[in-house]
Amino acid sequence: MQVTIECQKRPEGSKPNTLRRQGLIPAALYGHKGTESISLIIKEKDAQLLLKKASVNNTLVDVNIPDVPWSGKALIREVQTHPWKRFVYHLSFFSVAAHGKIDVVVPLNLVGESSGVKQGGIIEQVITEISVQCLPESIPETIEIDISPLKIGDSISVGDLQLSEGVTYLDDPTQTILTVMAPKKGSATEEETAEASA
């Protein structure tokens, strides 16, 4: 997915609350020259649109800064929001243009219908995303898990995942992702089965 954000260099001495009243969101870009950072501002409406398309620590974003001699791709590292209102207070980007492999978080997507579920079992999913390491151009949008073969009592762990070439998981390989649990005694499914066999 191609995602772009237009930024400007933040004026020196500008106050965050003053910028927000003007419809501008303070932001920072890290890693473009080692540890050096650039203070930026982004239009609030552009920031809201960006967050609808991009995910934190997952989506590569083309960051355009017309008044700075830099252009490249970055990850959204952090989004600061108002404690109870839905206002974005600050965005942090991390440049990946000059880096090798990076650590990102990728959501897990279950596909298929488990044979265990067809028998009345229940999918109990413990984690919905994992941390992986890969090159910026190899970041997967999601990792699909085919649950079709799973019977009641079967489970899938991080180490069971089939990842693309060049993508490695960072989480504990023994970490359980999901388990097909047997239906609880007296559940509607068991009662229906008993009635059908009566």
From Swiss-Prot:
Q: Which Pfam families does this one have?
A: Ribosomal_L25p, Ribosomal_TL5_C
Which controlled-vocabulary keywords does the entry list? Ribonucleoprotein, Ribosomal protein, RNA-binding, rRNA-binding
Gene Ontology biological-process entries:
translation
Q: Name one GO cellular component term.
A: cytosolic large ribosomal subunit
Keyword flag Ribosomal protein:
yes
A Gene Ontology molecular-function term?
A: 5S rRNA binding
Q: Does the keyword Manganese apply?
A: no
- Its quaternary structure? Part of the 50S ribosomal subunit; part of the 5S rRNA/L5/L18/L25 subcomplex. Contacts the 5S rRNA. Binds to the 5S rRNA independently of L5 and L18.
- PANTHER family with a match to the protein in the record: RIBOSOMAL PROTEIN L25/GLN-TRNA SYNTHETASE, ANTI-CODON-BINDING DOMAIN-CONTAINING PROTEIN, RIBOSOMAL PROTEIN L25_GLN-TRNA SYNTHETASE, ANTI-CODON-BINDING DOMAIN-CONTAINING PROTEIN
* Similarity field: Belongs to the bacterial ribosomal protein bL25 family. CTC subfamily.
Q: What does this protein do?
A: This is one of the proteins that binds to the 5S RNA in the ribosome where it forms part of the central protuberance.
Q: Which named protein is this?
A: Large ribosomal subunit protein bL25
